[in-house]
């Protein structure tokens, strides 16, 4: 009879968790930042607030965003005007829209990841689903499993209302699942739709206005597993370590409250300073075991919370401008898609590395870092190891 220790060892994978495929998706409706102030104040019936509109225009101009994809259309706002008010009861209709659409958008990204992976979906053993948009039972994970036709025995983890750091959280969770379950293949999906946070402008809520200028909709999926079969699977990045911490005395720095009026967004103006002053400690703890202290020797996947955060991190760590190119590109083309952003950036980096004929998936570098920042104020730190392009 096998001992507990023997059973435990047999259940574990031998190698590190590895990202094997990536897929992304967005809604069809695209809005351009250059004329978004006109659009936003028109659809929320707020064109009389001329001074606030000028202020919002300046926020949009400084956002470094070119365009975003948003599920909510002008027609939907005409049908449900309470969504476009600043503080009108609207949670029921928001929930109706979100709980239907979040799994659908997640499905689009998941199908792309599954196609790239190239294996039967019956081989997916675990599903990790994350969204800040809507809550119900059974959850979006259950709906997605059915939409995709996954096995009823798929082991599901549902993460609601984690916010912008959760792209790191899902990778940390998938890493633990893959490494502690031999043969596991984990489908990870982040799907975000801003119907829950959209609202009209108010002179008394400039932090809400910042959110309206930054956030976009999108979904991303990755497949994670240990000990890949190189004959049929194409490794992209290894997940070497993963950690989470929160910054003391920063509980309200980034916050969201679910109320009858939807999810309200609150932001302290010193968030860029809080993150930049604490990020090096996270880096040191993560990379000391590897003997790495030159942050410019890493490839970077940083959640693009906004240009001020990226500028502050860049300045504090003396990063070369090119280090956050992939991050800034995703911010520019999609806006802040909360948990999905870092997975979009991973996709951008491996594509950019392939196009540029780099030696590895990490822009030719071996080691990289993925950061998520969000409510708490919480920081997720994932150490990545790239894969040589010749094995790809």
UniProtKB/Swiss-Prot annotation:
Main subcellular location of this protein, as a coarse class: cytoplasm
EC number: 2.3.1.95
Active site feature: 164
One cellular component term from this protein's GO annotations in UniProt: cytoplasm
Up-regulation conditions: By stress.
Keywords: Acyltransferase, Cytoplasm, Plant defense, Stress response, Transferase
GO molecular-function terms, A-Z: trihydroxystilbene synthase activity
Pathway the protein acts in: Phytoalexin biosynthesis; 3,4',5-trihydroxystilbene biosynthesis; 3,4',5-trihydroxystilbene from trans-4-coumarate: step 2/2
Protein biosynthesis listed as a keyword: no
Pfam families membership: Chal_sti_synt_C, Chal_sti_synt_N
Reaction catalyzed: 4-coumaroyl-CoA + 3 malonyl-CoA + 3 H(+) = trans-resveratrol + 4 CO2 + 4 CoA
Subcellular compartments: Cytoplasm
PROSITE patterns recorded: CHALCONE_SYNTH (PS00441)
Gene Ontology BP terms: biosynthetic process; defense response
InterPro entries the UniProt entry points to: Chalcone/stilbene_synt_C, Chalcone/stilbene_synt_N, Chalcone/stilbene_synthase_AS, Polyketide_synthase_type-III, Thiolase-like
Keyword Protein biosynthesis attached: no
Residue numbers binding substrate: 55-58, 267, 305-307
Function, as annotated: Mediates resistance to pathogens which are sensitive to stilbenes.
Family statement drawn from the similarity comment of this UniProt entry: Belongs to the thiolase-like superfamily. Chalcone/stilbene synthases family.
Name by which UniProt lists this protein: Stilbene synthase 2
Organism encoding this protein: Vitis vinifera
